[in-house]
Amino acid sequence: MAGHSKWANIKHKKAAQDAKRGKIFTRLIKEITVAARLGGGDPNSNPRLRLAVDKAYEQNMPKENVERAIKRGSGDLEGVNYEEIRYEGYGIAGAAVLVDCMTDNRVRTVADVRHAFTKYGGNLGTDGSVGFLFKHCGQLLFAPGTDEDKLMEVALEAGAEDIIAHDDGSIEVITAPYEFVAVKEALEKAGFKAELAEVTMKPVNETELTGDDSVKMQKLLDALESIDDVQEVYTTAVID
């Protein structure tokens, strides 16, 4: 893993997310709605919903918006019925890309995703073409200077799978998806606040890009992110 660039990449990702706050609200509302539809409207018994609600509040989403989305999902209010779809493909220099979507029109979505891949030098693959290059897991990243020994003790006790100390001083905690909330809460209770905390698709191996390849890959990722139906974009690319 490229430890030296981990922290810079996370800070870049956070800045990009902050710049797209309006779109983040839309995505979170979709996620809350679908999570409530699939697992019920009680966050205490629905880990996926709990995670989505926590993220919404971290983004300062008004409580009434959150509650309305839960009611739409659980059937108490009328709403759009979204379908979850994952597309797989390749970007620049063979970097793998996963694109998670929620849509009410599959034909529109696949056309938009294919157009972005084609326009910016990638290509849309078939189901299963790159999914095996990622691991579904919880990920928490802590700033350089964090007490590694204490964090490791708390994280492992709470059920974390792995702790990675990066070259830049940041510390990464990996969990099984279903253990993520418990580990996050245990660490917060012990005074550890993650700079990034999410259930994600983590690359098994990373593809480091530099120069023109970095610029081209970023354009592809930005194009995919800008599609209304896209919820998340994951890639093995590390952009210098």
UniProtKB/Swiss-Prot annotation:
GO molecular function ontology, one term from the record: DNA binding
Q: InterPro entries of this UniProt entry?
A: Integrase-like_N, TACO1_YebC-like_2nd/3rd_dom, TACO1_YebC_N, Transcrip_reg_TACO1-like, Transcrip_reg_TACO1-like_dom3, YebC-like
* One biological process term in Gene Ontology: regulation of DNA-templated transcription
SUPFAM superfamilies from the xrefs?
A: YebC-like (SSF75625)
Q: Where in the cell is it found?
A: Cytoplasm
Q: Where is the signal peptide?
A: none
**Assigned keywords, A-Z:** Cytoplasm, DNA-binding, Transcription, Transcription regulation
Q: What is its main location?
A: cytoplasm
Q: Which Pfam families match?
A: TACO1_YebC_N, Transcrip_reg
Q: Which domain of life is it from?
A: Bacteria
GO cellular component assignments: cytosol
Q: Does the keyword Transcription regulation apply?
A: yes
- Family the entry assigns: Belongs to the TACO1 family.
PANTHER family attached to this UniProt entry: TRANSCRIPTIONAL REGULATORY PROTEIN YEBC-RELATED (PTHR12532:SF6), TRANSLATIONAL ACTIVATOR OF CYTOCHROME C OXIDASE 1 (PTHR12532)
Q: What is this protein called?
A: Probable transcriptional regulatory protein Nmul_A2722
What species is this protein from?
Nitrosospira multiformis (strain ATCC 25196 / NCIMB 11849 / C 71)
